[in-house]
Amino acid sequence: MLDAANYTPRLKAQYAETIRAALKEEFGYKNDMMIPKLEKIVLNIGCGAEAVKDSKKAKSAQEDLSKIAGQKAITTTAKKSIAGFRVREDMPMGAKVTLRGERMYEFLDRLITIAMPRIRDFRGVKPSFDGRGNFAMGIKEHIVFPEIDFDKVDEVWGMDIVIATTAKTDAEAKSLLKHFNMPFNA
């Protein structure tokens, strides 16, 4: 039986035991504080036109995202009105959640080992970094996560996943994520 007081997520332990040393050797860091680490993971579901037609869609997306993340997601709202799209200011448009600490490592583990292999025609993720060491990716169907019961889903949503790191360059961030077994296709 797991002892909750002594529990450490698998990827967090792997980072402390092997990944830090490998990155220090690979990039020649002189100080341990220079070694890149994961800062946060932001998950976002945008409902778009569906939320305009039915306000319950954003609530449904929020509930699904809360199940996936393991913590309560917040509803995102429209910043301004756009008459052409029938969008009003403060209208619910989706949901987002920011993961840090142990939940972040647990989510990354589930994403890489469980959800990604379940994606249809999966050939790896495109290495899309922002130039400052942050990685962004999209998933077309949120139902690839085991927390979502396919029979109870009223709508299949796409999802944005942003992994923020303390890396200064894209090469450092890519190496960090590769050590976590992120399956890049190039």
UniProtKB/Swiss-Prot annotation:
One of its GO terms (cellular component) is ribonucleoprotein complex. GO terms for molecular function: rRNA binding; structural constituent of ribosome; tRNA binding. It comes from the Bacteria. Keywords: Ribonucleoprotein, Ribosomal protein, RNA-binding, rRNA-binding, tRNA-binding. The keyword Transmembrane helix does not apply. InterPro entries: Ribosomal_uL5 (IPR002132), Ribosomal_uL5_bac-type (IPR020930), Ribosomal_uL5_C (IPR031309), Ribosomal_uL5_CS (IPR020929), Ribosomal_uL5_dom_sf (IPR022803), Ribosomal_uL5_N (IPR031310). It holds the Pfam family Ribosomal_L5_C. Part of the 50S ribosomal subunit; part of the 5S rRNA/L5/L18/L25 subcomplex. Contacts the 5S rRNA and the P site tRNA. Forms a bridge to the 30S subunit in the 70S ribosome. HAMAP family: Ribosomal_uL5_B. Belongs to the universal ribosomal protein uL5 family. This is one of the proteins that bind and probably mediate the attachment of the 5S RNA into the large ribosomal subunit, where it forms part of the central protuberance. In the 70S ribosome it contacts protein S13 of the 30S subunit (bridge B1b), connecting the 2 subunits; this bridge is implicated in subunit movement. Contacts the P site tRNA; the 5S rRNA and some of its associated proteins might help stabilize positioning of ribosome-bound tRNAs. This is Large ribosomal subunit protein uL5. The lineage of its organism: Bacteria, Pseudomonadati, Pseudomonadota, Alphaproteobacteria, Rhodobacterales.
